[in-house]
Design a protein with these regions (language model features):
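Cell wall/extracellular polymer interaction/catalysis modules
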Residues: 1-172
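Low-complexity intrinsically disordered segments
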Residues: 173-177
Length: 177
């Protein structure tokens, strides 16, 4: 997943479907498995799946930022870790395994990102605007500025794709860049 618009009230991204052969598998300094993209050119029209919508992006990892992204009121200071605002913060960049589990809140089977530092219960679900998420990733088509359309149909298609990959023994991860 590549974030393409980090706005004041929301974050828009693009979700791509790649195979294990497109990813470099390694271990980080905490001993956790991580996946990085072998070739950024793989994020293209052929691998594009859908758009995503999340809450406001904050610099939770404390990375160096280009001047146009710096905004202290939004927790966007260069080389300084931001504070998480519960329910209003996009998850940090990284690689997270995905499982499909029954959501008590939504009362249906939904993708769940596992091991997101500082977050719990991060789901991928349907919704149309930033107000529809409390930190989760919404999927759909970004045809209206700051919003998604076709969210339910996109979610159904994504769950089918994840289950098919799992049934074939493939690892299912979301890597956010």
């Amino acid at each position: 997943m590549k974030r393409i618009a980090k706005k004041k009230e929301y974050t828009i991204g693009r979700l791509y479907i790649l195979g294990d052969e497109d990813m470099e598998v390694g271990v980080n300094n905490r001993g956790k498995s991580v996946r990085t993209l072998k070739n950024p050119d793989q994020l293209n029209r052929q691998t594009y799946f859908c758009d995503t919508l999340e809450p406001t992006w904050r610099n939770l990892l404390g990375v160096k930022l280009p001047p146009q992204l710096v905004n202290e009121s939004l927790g966007r200071q260069s080389s300084k870790k931001a504070r998480k605002v519960v329910g209003l913060t996009a998850i940090p960049e990284g690689s997270y395994p995905v499982v499909i589990t029954k959501s008590p809140r939504f009362r249906r089977w939904l993708p769940l990102l596992v091991g997101v530092p500082g977050f719990s219960g991060i789901r991928i679900h349907s919704g149309n605007m930033a107000a529809d998420t409390r930190g989760c990733i919404l999927v759909g088509e970004n045809t209206i500025v700051g919003r998604l359309t076709s969210s339910r149909a996109t979610l159904t298609k994504l769950i089918t794709t994840i289950m098919a990959a799992s049934d074939q023994g493939e690892a299912v991860w979301v890597t956010i860049v």
